Amino acid sequence: MPELTKSAILKFYKRKDIQDAIIEHALHKEIGMQFGVGNFGKRPDVLTYPRDVLELALQDVTSLHSSEEIWENPLAISSDLTKKELNNVRTGWDLILDVDCPDWEISKLTTHLFIKALKENGVTDISCKFSGNKGFHIGVPFESFPKEVAGTKTKDMFPECPKKISLYLLNIISTRYITIKDNKIVFDNTYAFSIQELKDKFGEREFLITKCVRCKKKRKV
């Protein structure tokens, strides 16, 4: 792989389409900026103009991170705000599933299964991006969700709703897409691994758990 030089980075961020795409995604979101290892910009911060992107690249910014939450004014948020106050200034949130696995093969497979579960639940507006190392970010925009759920505004159901959605998807994956066949764990009826192969990837750990169907408690077998 060719070395990622400063000139190559600047050439990339000079592109108008790249700048516009970043600014469009950053609209009404808090933007975190990292410079090098462990050096972060002030909070809260925003990106407003396309030229801001190139300016940050010139300042050696190494990564940009947008908030899941969407705000009326990102600069007005503070860690001192109560949940009620945050609800008043939050206009929505995007669902972000952060797949971070130490094994590249399993990371790709896990991402595939999450996307499959979303699609089988009628979700069509799905994004997926490589997030570095062996990880992926799966995104579903706030516009994909109903405005209210059981009389509660969806925008106010953060972070509870994303957590419940994640657990729901994990349950679908574990109960529908993973089976045991010929002493192997089979994912999506296609990808099979023996327990030893998984131990080689992840070390000694418990790969199979039996739970009671009614109470969901772990059972000894």
Question: PLM features: residue spans?
Answer:
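DNA replication initiation on ssDNA origins
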Residues: 1-94, 101-104, 110, 148, ...
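Generic hydrophobic/packing signal
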Residues: 70, 96, 99-101, 111, 115, 118, 122, 126, ...
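Catalytic micro-motifs at enzyme active sites that drive phosphoryl/nucleotidyl and oxygen chemistry
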Residues: 79-87, 115-116, 123-131
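Histidine-centered divalent-metal-coordination microenvironment in nucleic-acid enzymes
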Residues: 94-97, 125-154
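Long, well-ordered alpha-helical scaffolding segments within enzyme catalytic domains
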Residues: 106-124, 159-173
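Short, glycine/acidic-rich hinge or "gate" loops at secondary-structure transitions
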Residues: 127-134, 179-189
